[in-house]
C-alpha cells in the first residue's frame, strides 16, 4: 500500500498513494473520512469553492445557463472534458446540455445501471439463497454420511458489519439451518462451492494492482465479510521492537508477515501492506512511532470460499457439530470436470439475503464494488437458467450474460444504442463508458419504474449519508440532492435528482474527465458540486414544453 495518505469512509475509501501517486477507491467514491487532517483540508477546498459563490441561487433559468456555460469553459478545464445534462421531470424541458452525447468514464456512476438492472430483472423483494446440500439426510443418530456442500449464489450480506461486528452471528442462521435438519456430525468433507458464478474472480478491465485493496475484493458466490479482513498495527513496547499486528475478524486463513519496526516517539508512520496475487499472506512493512495510536486498513483474501468454510467450521463446532473430513472448495473450473446437479441432492436447509431493495442501498450509498458485480452475475445466471436450452451460451461467463442482459434492458429503457459500453458492473474498470444523455434517460426511466422508491432510496443524500455525507453541507443542496457519485483517477461524476428552490424536480448527470487542478482551486468533486448547489438554489421554474 506504500506510504500513503487516505480518505476513509466506513465502507468505502479514496486513497492518495503518495509513493505511487495513485487514486484508489472502493466504489471509487468516498464520503466519511477518518484522517482528520485530510478531512479538514478536503472540507476547506470544497467550502472555499462554495464560499466564492453568492448565497442566493440563480434567479432565472437563463442566469443558470450563463453560470453553467461560464463554469465548464473556464481556462483551468482546457485539458479536461465536461459533460452535463439537466432535465426537468415536471416539464420535460432540457435546461442545459453540454457534451451530453459524448462518451465518458463514469466510474461508480456505472452502479446506477447495474442496480437498475437488478431491480428490474429480479425485483425489489428478491432475495439470494445460500443452500446446504448433501447426498442424503442424516441418519437417526444425526450423522451425515458424505460431504456437506455449502452452495453459494452470491449473497453479499453475510458479514460482520451487518451483525454487530460478529462474524459468527452472521453465520448463525446457516448453522441453525443445519442443526434444524438434525445434523450433529459430518462424516465427510465440508465443501465450499462457489461455482454458481462462472468466470474469473475479478471484473473485466480491473487493474491487477487493485486486487489487494478492499475495493478490489474477489467476486465469489460464497462471499463472506465483503471478502476482506481488517489489519491493525500498533507500536511495540519500545523503539526498535516490531509493531504488534492483529486481524479482525480473527482467522488463520490469512497470515501476516511482520516486517515492521517501532520508531522513536513522533516518527513519521510509513506502514504499508502487500498481498501478492493468489496468495493469502500479507506483508506488513514500515514503521510507526512509539505511543502512536493504532492504524488499521482492510485487505482482501484470495479464494473467499475457503475463508467462508473455515469460519463456518468454527461456527458449527461452537454449536456442537463435529466434522470428520477436511475443508475444501469447488469453483467453476473444478465443476467443469466434476459437475454438480443440485436437483439430485438433498437440500438440508438454506438462508436468504436481505431484499434486493436493501442490497441496493448497501451498494449505492457506500459505493460497494463487490456487491455490484455480484448483482450483475446474479442477473446473468438467472438469464442462463432461463435459456438453459440454448447451448451456445454455455461458455459465456456470468459477467458476459449480465452485460448482455444490461444491454437488452437499456434498449427497453429507451437508452440510445452505443451510448453505454460496459465490461463490468461496478465502474472499477476504466473500459466502462457512457454518456450524460444515457444516464439521464436511465434515471428518467427508473423514476417511472415500479421499483422507483427502492431505487431513489438507495442513492446517497448530500450532506447526510453515504459517499455524499461530507459534500455540499450548508448549501441548498444539503438534504436535497440524491445522487450517485463516481471517482477514479482523472474521472469524476455525479448523477441524480434535485428539487429547486422553486419546487421543480430536476434530473441531472455531470461528468468531468481528465481534470487535474494546477492552481490548487479544488478537486474534481468540488468543481462538480457547485452545479447541484446552483440547481437547488434556482428560484425560477422552466417553461412548459
Protein language model features and the residues they cover:
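Small-residue-rich helix-loop
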Residues: 95-97, 169, 366, 376-545
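Bacterial N-terminal signal peptides
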Residues: 35-48
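Short, low-complexity, charge-dense intrinsically disordered segments
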Residues: 3, 10-24, 42
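A short, well-structured edge-of-sheet supersecondary motif
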Residues: 73-98, 328-329
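Short active-site loop at a secondary-structure junction
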Residues: 97-117
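Conserved serine DD-peptidase/penicillin-binding transpeptidase domain
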Residues: 52-73, 120-417, 526, 533-544
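A short glycine/serine-rich beta->alpha loop
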Residues: 99-104, 298, 426-429
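Residue-level preference for non-acidic, small/hydrophobic
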Residues: 92, 111-115, 190, 222, ...
Amino acid at each position: 500500500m506504500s506510504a500513503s495518505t487516505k480518505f476513509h469512509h466506513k465502507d468505502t475509501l479514496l486513497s492518495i498513494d503518495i509513493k505511487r501517486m495513485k487514486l484508489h477507491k472502493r466504489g471509487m467514491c468516498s464520503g466519511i473520512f477518518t484522517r482528520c487532517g485530510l478531512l479538514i483540508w478536503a472540507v476547506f477546498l470544497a467550502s472555499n469553492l462554495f464560499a466564492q459563490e453568492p448565497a442566493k441561487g440563480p434567479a432565472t433559468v437563463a442566469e443558470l445557463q450563463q453560470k453553467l456555460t461560464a463554469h465548464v469553459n473556464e481556462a483551468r478545464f482546457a485539458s479536461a472534458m465536461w459533460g452535463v445534462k439537466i432535465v426537468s421531470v415536471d416539464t420535460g424541458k432540457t435546461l442545459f446540455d453540454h457534451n451530453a452525447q459524448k462518451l465518458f468514464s463514469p466510474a461508480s456512476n456505472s452502479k446506477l445501471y447495474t442496480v437498475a438492472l437488478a431491480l428490474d430483472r429480479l425485483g425489489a423483494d428478491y432475495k439470494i439463497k445460500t443452500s446446504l446440500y448433501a447426498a442424503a439426510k442424516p441418519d437417526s443418530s444425526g450423522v451425515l454420511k458424505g460431504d456437506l456442500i455449502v452452495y453459494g449464489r452470491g449473497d453479499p450480506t453475510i458479514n460482520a458489519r451487518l451483525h454487530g461486528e460478529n462474524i459468527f452471528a452472521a453465520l448463525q442462521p446457516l448453522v441453525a439451518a443445519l442443526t434444524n435438519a438434525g445434523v450433529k456430525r459430518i462424516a465427510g468433507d465440508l465443501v465450499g462451492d462457489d461455482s454458481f458464478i462462472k468466470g474469473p474472480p475479478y471484473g473485466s478491465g480491473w487493474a491487477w494492482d487493485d486486487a489487494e485493496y478492499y475495493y478490489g475484493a474477489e467476486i465469489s458466490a460464497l462471499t463472506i465479510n465483503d471478502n476482506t479482513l481488517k489489519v491493525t498495527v500498533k507500536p511495540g513496547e519500545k523503539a526498535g521492537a516490531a509493531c504488534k499486528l492483529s486481524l479482525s475478524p480473527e482467522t488463520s486463513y490469512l497470515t501476516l508477515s511482520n516486517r515492521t519496526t517501532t520508531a522513536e516517539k513522533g516518527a513519521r508512520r510509513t506502514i504499508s501492506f502487500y498481498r501478492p496475487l493468489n496468495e493469502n499472506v500479507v506483508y506488513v512493512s514500515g514503521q510507526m512511532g512509539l505511543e502512536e495510536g493504532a492504524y488499521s486498513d482492510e485487505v482482501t483474501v484470495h479464494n473467499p470460499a475457503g475463508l467462508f468454510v473455515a469460519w463456518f467450521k468454527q461456527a458449527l463446532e461452537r454449536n456442537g457439530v463435529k466434522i470428520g473430513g477436511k475443508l475444501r472448495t469447488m469453483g467453476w473450473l473444478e465443476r467443469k470436470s466434476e459437475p454438480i446437479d443440485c436437483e439430485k441432492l438433498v437440500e438440508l436447509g438454506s438462508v436468504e439475503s436481505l431484499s434486493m431493495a436493501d442490497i441496493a442501498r448497501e451498494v449505492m450509498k457506500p459505493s460497494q464494488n463487490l456487491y455490484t458485480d455480484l448483482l450483475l452475475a446474479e442477473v446473468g445466471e438467472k438469464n442462463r437458467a432461463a435459456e438453459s436450452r440454448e447451448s451456445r451460451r454455455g461458455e459465456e461467463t456470468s459477467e458476459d450474460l449480465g452485460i448482455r442482459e444490461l444491454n437488452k434492458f437499456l434498449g427497453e429503457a429507451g437508452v440510445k444504442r452505443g451510448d453505454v459500453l460496459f465490461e463490468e458492473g461496478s465502474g472499477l474498470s476504466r473500459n466502462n463508458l457512457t454518456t450524460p444523455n444515457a444516464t439521464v434517460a436511465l434515471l428518467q426511466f427508473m423514476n417511472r419504474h415500479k421499483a422507483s422508491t427502492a431505487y431513489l432510496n438507495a442513492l446517497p443524500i448530500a450532506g447526510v449519508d453515504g459517499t455524499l455525507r461530507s459534500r455540499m453541507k450548508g448549501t441548498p443542496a444539503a438534504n436535497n440532492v440524491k445522487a450517485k457519485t463516481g471517482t477514479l483517477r482523472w474521472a469524476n461524476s455525479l448523477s441524480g435528482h434535485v428539487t429547486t428552490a422553486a419546487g421543480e424536480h430536476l434530473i441531472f448527470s455531470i461528468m468531468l474527465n481528465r481534470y487535474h487542478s494546477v492552481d490548487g482551486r479544488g478537486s474534481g468533486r468540488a468543481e462538480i458540486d457547485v452545479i447541484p448547489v446552483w440547481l437547488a438554489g434556482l428560484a425560477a421554474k422552466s417553461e412548459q414544453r
